[in-house]
């Protein structure tokens, strides 16, 4: 019997930040949470996001870039927006769905070191959530 909660990471294109968050979420929260990610649009998984996660031995090549699924959104226990655009244009969530904003810079189109920095910041934030629940 599965009593896992559902966490849903959202950003604009489901390309970089939410993909990395989904991967870290599965690593740190997978025992207790079903972990999903999506975007306002689906831009495809950024090759540098794949490369950044490979650098820490996490393979996200099988993750897909998806638009927001209203069923997952409406049934999630926690929705986490990762960029201000997703926070402002995300469809409304029902009152029983806890929604929080964890803002991270968009590394797309920037230096490689930005992908590494954002990857590590997302890891630390999700690790903290796994340890203290906030």
UniProtKB/Swiss-Prot annotation:
One Pfam family linked to the record: LMWPc
SMART domains assigned: LMWPc
GO BP terms in the entry: response to arsenic-containing substance
Entry annotation: catalytic residues: 11 (nucleophile), 83 (nucleophile), 90 (nucleophile)
Keywords for the protein's UniProt record, in alphabetical order: Arsenical resistance, Cytoplasm, Disulfide bond, Oxidoreductase, Redox-active center
Top-level lineage group: Bacteria
EC number: 1.20.4.4
One term of GO molecular function: protein tyrosine phosphatase activity
Residue ranges that the Swiss-Prot or TrEMBL entry lists as coiled coil: none
First-tier enzyme category under EC: oxidoreductase
Disulfide bonds: 11-83, 83-90
Chief site of localization: cytoplasm
Catalytic activity: arsenate + [thioredoxin]-dithiol + H(+) = arsenite + [thioredoxin]-disulfide + H2O
GO cellular component: cytoplasm
Gene3D superfamilies associated with the record: 3.40.50.2300
Subcellular location: Cytoplasm
Function: Catalyzes the reduction of arsenate [As(V)] to arsenite [As(III)].
Family statement: Belongs to the low molecular weight phosphotyrosine protein phosphatase family. Thioredoxin-coupled ArsC subfamily.
HAMAP family hit by this protein: Arsenate_reduct
Protein name (database record): Arsenate reductase
Organism: Bacillus cereus (strain 03BB102)
Gene expressing this chain: arsC
